[in-house]
């Protein structure tokens, strides 16, 4: 352990400077390799001391491509198939920056930006967190069939021409649409026509907030504006001030239908009301419990009557 600490201390200045630079750059995700599934990758040997650089980047709270400690989201499973030789994969995940050890080779579109000791920082031109796409296929099914479908789509030519099938998961597949089974997606995608088609328009600008993304878009033909963030029903969209439905697009990103014209689109993550109530209750409860232990039985009775009683009633009304 002492040897690990000495090595980490020796490389800490370079990493600190790298992290500071990444925070100063325009918003975008960082690619520093992937955690692999049974095959060798340069990330496996990219360490400072006894800690992987990939893990250090994640613990800094930076927006990363790829998983490390968990794969709860649908997107995180698929990212292990990221192909660093294909520009469309960088664009798909908005992998705008690359961190890699010196000597690691990349395609020409991965441009050197700055070196920090033995760490190289690169930049890739992408469309940002938004893109205008099409969706000519619709699949419905469950999570067990999602990974084979999404990984076959990612390996195909469809991401390169911005063809993103719509996915209806679980109960959502019981809508008026007639989706193909998600279990059939591998075969269907392998036979799908890959064609670019005319321009769909331009994402003129984007703003990134803590729980929101906003874009000004000029659309030339009916399209879906895709936000490169994992789909969840708590994401709410407004187009020109009007609340609009969202859909899930491969590889589990958020899509909003747009007609031709200029539009201002806002997507916000809004936690459910009950979850917020429980979160606030949890924050309030811990210090109040500590006080109740200090003040004794009288405070406990007051706390139960004046605090827990009204909150319990609020939760019951919410369920009712």
Regions from the language model: what does each represent?
Residues 1-61:
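Extracytoplasmic
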Residues 5-6, 73-76, 221:
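Short, contiguous strand/loop micro-motifs
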Residues 10-14, 79-82, 90, 219:
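Short, glycine/acidic-rich beta->alpha junctions
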Residues 20-24, 28-31, 89-320:
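Flexible, solvent-exposed extracytoplasmic
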Residues 35, 70, 103:
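Residue-level "edge-of-site" marker
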Residues 38, 72, 119-122:
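A short acidic, often aromatic-flanked loop/helix-cap motif at beta-alpha or helix-coil junctions
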Residues 49-66, 103-108, 121-123:
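Repeat-unit-sized solenoid/scaffold elements
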Residues 53-95:
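Luminal/periplasmic acceptor-recognition loop/helix of membrane-associated glycosyltransferases
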